[in-house]
Amino acid sequence: MFRLISFCWVLLLANPSQGQDINVLLKEASNFERVQKENEALEKYKLVLTQDPVNIKALVKSAELSASIGGRQGDKNNKRLFYETALAYAKRAWQADSNHADAAYAMAMISGRMTDIETENKQIVAYVKDIKSYSDKALSINPDHGKANYTLGKWHYEMVTLSGLKKAAVKLFYGGLPSGDLEKAISFMEKCKTLEPYFALNYLDLAKAYKEARQPAKAIEVLNKLVKLPVRTGDDPAIKAEGAKMLEAIQ
């Protein structure tokens, strides 16, 4: 018995608590994100998931980072691979805890990304519906979830401005176009701006919504703030550049 107890103590000393290891990995991942090393951050979150497969933070972050990295891929097949991987992480988060606002947001976020690569009309419409339903779910859990406010605002904006094949598909399979509302788009994205003041993509799409609403002064105000934002993610340089180009065109 004494030998068994001694052996157990050796194992405990050799392997620090799983929770401590996970906290260290999460901190390291966050540090990589702060310096825009998204691939390295993603690998750290994956390591967390090897120890805790239902860790919501790691699953949601893995979904976000996979989507972000995928969005910058020039090759369509690589983009699809990253997006489908992001969708798998989001689904795991949702299955782990469907009452977690971050899990619902992750499903809404990646559903939006999937509409950009999906070619089957019925599936495009299914993703469009999912953006709305999962955003609504996230906000029913936490009305102050910044990125869920953005995602729902973007959904309203896109329902107003849909064009081309995506518009035709939504009209055909949705039973008419959903009731997008430009005022709601602006309201949700303005709330996100308050809750997530460094989320560059929200500024860009909010400016587009103001432009669509024929409020150029408001669009210019938002764009002026966007171009002054610090770079926080790998997507930010391109977002800020697009904002600067849009600002030049409006002024």
Task: Report residues per predicted region.
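N-terminal leader/linker segments that initiate helical-solenoid repeat arrays
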Residues: S17-G71
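Short coil/linker segments at helix-helix boundaries
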Residues: F32-E40, L65-N99, M109-D144, K154-C192, ...
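Bacterial N-terminal signal peptides
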Residues: I5-A14
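Terminal, low-structured helical/coil segments at or just beyond the last alpha-helical repeat
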Residues: L162-F173, S179, E196-L201, I220-V222, ...
